[in-house]
């Protein structure tokens, strides 16, 4: 697309990645799209998701990230190797890859883990062949610059960052304190993912693959110190996975309210953080985290269908 005029290249980039994003949301919701409410509203809810407009305004990669993340998780059971390739293609977003290998190992998803690893190695090899080994020195230098200027010093604006690290810095905390707080959040997110994805876990009702997928996306946002407002686009597949897992019988009124708040929040997150110091995006991500964990832990505490049958016998 570098050969195209800028406006045309931008339109093609955003249009193609937006189409991928919508296709993935449709695939996630396919099992429940016969429901009247879902059939009427899913496309409108996905297309009008406020984070989508934030991403469009920045011309950024939120649609692609949401599409790859959602597709990789949707393909995990039927096409594990393809799932791994899709995870591997997310290597351009390394801050979102912190928990993915942990989840795959905890869940015993060896083929997906292998596929992701091979894809990342292949991409790294292709970059080296195309640009030479100096590309990695440039990458390391740019990473250091991004860490110092954009993250620690907040040159991008702490109100634009939607992470625990940024919240502490926005409230006047030092860099060391912000790293400690972020590390604590990352450890909690990691342990939650291991709990949810560990091999032999329950895969029925709301404790199924869809809820595990939603939790991984949400925990990824909690674990990363570098989450920009347009990155909240990946909440769309997380919300879709939760709806697919729990709709309609396992939703309570407060569940629906929480999902509605998460849907609206990206529209105001940056402005509210800048005006009041309240990290709305982070609060919504944390709220979704507790919602997913509540459903998961409730299902884990209930006897399985097989156990119930044995007890009845």
Ranges and model annotations:
Residues 1-82, 104-236, 243-244, 248, ...:
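Primarily membrane-embedded glycan-assembly and transfer machineries that use lipid-linked glycans
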Residues 92-95, 122-127, 257-258:
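Membrane-embedded alpha-helical segments of transport systems
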Residues 241-313:
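Aromatic-enriched
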Residues 46-47, 90, 97-98, 234, ...:
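Hydrophobic alpha-helical transmembrane segments of integral membrane proteins
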Residues 76-80, 93, 268-276:
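Generic structural signal for short, solvent-exposed loop/turn connectors between secondary structure elements
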Residues 87-104, 225-231:
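Transmembrane helices and adjacent periplasmic/lumenal helix-loop junctions
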């Amino acid at each position: 697309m570098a050969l195209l005029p800028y406006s045309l290249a931008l339109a093609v980039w955003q249009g193609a990645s937006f189409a991928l994003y919508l296709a993935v949301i449709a695939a996630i919701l396919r099992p429940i799209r016969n429901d009247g409410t879902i059939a009427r509203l899913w496309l409108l809810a996905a297309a009008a998701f406020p984070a989508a407009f934030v991403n469009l305004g920045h011309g950024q990669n939120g649609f692609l990230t949401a599409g790859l993340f959602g597709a990789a998780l949707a393909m995990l059971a039927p096409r594990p190797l393809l799932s791994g390739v899709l995870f591997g293609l997310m290597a351009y977003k390394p801050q979102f890859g912190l928990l993915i290998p942990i989840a795959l190992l905890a869940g015993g998803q060896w083929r997906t883990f292998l596929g992701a690893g091979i894809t990342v190695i292949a991409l790294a090899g292709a970059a080296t062949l195309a640009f030479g080994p100096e590309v990695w020195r440039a990458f390391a230098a740019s990473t250091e610059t991004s860490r110092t200027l954009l993250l620690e010093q907040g040159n991008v604006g702490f109100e634009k960052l939607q992470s625990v690290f940024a919240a502490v810095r926005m409230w006047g905390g030092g860099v060391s304190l912000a790293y400690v707080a972020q590390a604590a959040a990352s450890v909690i997110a990691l342990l939650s993912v291991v709990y949810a994805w560990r091999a032999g876990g329950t895969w029925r009702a709301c404790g199924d693959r869809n809820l595990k997928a939603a939790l991984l996306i949400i925990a990824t946002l909690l674990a990363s110190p570098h989450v920009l407002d347009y990155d909240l686009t990946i909440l769309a597949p997380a919300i879709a996975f939760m709806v697919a897992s729990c709709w309609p019988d396992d939703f309570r009124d407060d569940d629906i309210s929480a999902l509605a708040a998460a849907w609206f929040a990206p529209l105001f997150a940056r402005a509210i953080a800048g005006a009041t110091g309240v990290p709305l995006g982070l609060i919504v991500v944390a709220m979704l985290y507790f919602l997913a964990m509540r459903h998961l832990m409730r299902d884990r505490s209930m006897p399985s269908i097989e156990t119930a049958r044995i007890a009845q016998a």
